[in-house]
Amino acid sequence: MGPEALAQVVRPLAEIFRPEDYPDLLVGLETGDDAAIYRVSEELAIIFTTDFFTPVVDDPYEYGAISAVNAMSDVYAMGGDVVLALNICGFPRDMPPEIKAEILRGGAEKVADAGGVIAGGHTLDDDEPKYGLALIGFVHPDEFAAKVGARPGDVLFLTKRLGVGIITTAAKGGVAEENHMRGAVEQMLLLNRRAARLMKRVRCHAVTDITGFALIGHSLEMAQLSGVTLRFQIDRLPFLDGAREYAEEWLFPAGASCNKDAYESHVTFSSGIPDEVQMLLFTPETSGGLLICVDPKDADTLAALFSEQGQEYWIVGEAIEGPGAIEIL
């Protein structure tokens, strides 16, 4: 569902569940964050989220693993640890049992890698395969991360390359080179766990993960909630091998146009940035990285921590005073 349609569907819920009536709901509908957070004691809050989607790769094991990693990313974007998961499955009746088992095995092994446990789930018959997770994570109620809170001067860190969406679309069309698709798959299989743990050692004012609403959509949500403008340097943005090549061939998924229609009025591009590169920034990602707004005094510290622990990162821009918009220079 596109961002505008989603907002229209969810809007009535805010009138039923007013934030002032639920003081222990620390993060809920009002901010549209990556997950909900509910305080259960002075020392503990639970993070609750769910995500599932149709296959982005042909291999059933990798599909299950990627879907699980993508779902768990919301817990990491909130600064938490994965604890408990339930499978969400929609499978065709004629799908062989061994393929279903491989999908579930892929998801299960990634949840185990994250330190969590799968305790059950729900299945239904569906013409098109769907798989994902409902998740519970833990976080201290005073130490969670959120989209809101970015401040002018913050340094923007990104922990994964962009371009998964266009590469997987090219693969579905049979035109992606094998090494390009393999690079996208390997990135999608990477947990955001290490980056999330390291970012908590410095002053991070706002965090989100880059998934279906693309770099521009998710960063715009952060900018608007925080009351700042996020300025990105186009030459600092990292792209997977092949992404710009397929962009030049205009092999964009339909979701890119939906995102552009929803967000382009809030984005300013410098002249000279090619149309296809602009469109890449509206293109949905799967199992993307974290976008972290770091206090400028702590940017060098986080960069050093990431480097020491083998965590890839790119410093891609800064937060500035502004009306809640995006600038691409």
Model-found features: residue ranges?
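Helix-biased detector of long, well-ordered alpha-helical tracts
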Residues: 1-329
